Amino acid sequence: MSRTMEWAARPEHLGGIPRKLVIAMVGTFAKTVSSFLNTTSVHNADTLLRLVRSRPRRVPLITISNHMSTLDDPAMWGFKGFPIFDTKLARWVLAAEDICFRNALYSYIFRVGKCIPITRGGGIYQEHMNEALERLNDGEWVSICILFQKER
């Protein structure tokens, strides 16, 4: 069984139930972390929410964010007003293959959670970058989290 599990990434997989469960669990975790366990400040949240919810059909959205840990992407879902239970509005994210796709269980969970496996340092001409392009061509949202190091 391939660790990339393209079949698990399809919205119709098992009637969409696994995706709904994973998105709801991650959304609930994010809301708990962002709202109750941390002080969160979001700049221009209204702009992001408008783009996620109201952009014209078939118009893609790309977001790029800096991150410090592997929890940064899911924790971003927790700010006020973010649609944490809507699988259609949830983003696709490029996810490090060596962390998120280490075994069949992780691969399955991350694929139904709309993660695209990427080999860090593999450049732009790698297999799953084409999947990210397909998602964008379908008008979906692709999020890219990059570690931008501060200059010293």
What spans do the regions from the language model cover?
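A transmembrane-helix-recognition feature enriched in membrane-embedded lipid enzymes
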Residues: 2-46, 78, 82, 104-113
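Soluble catalytic domains of membrane acyltransferases
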Residues: 39-152
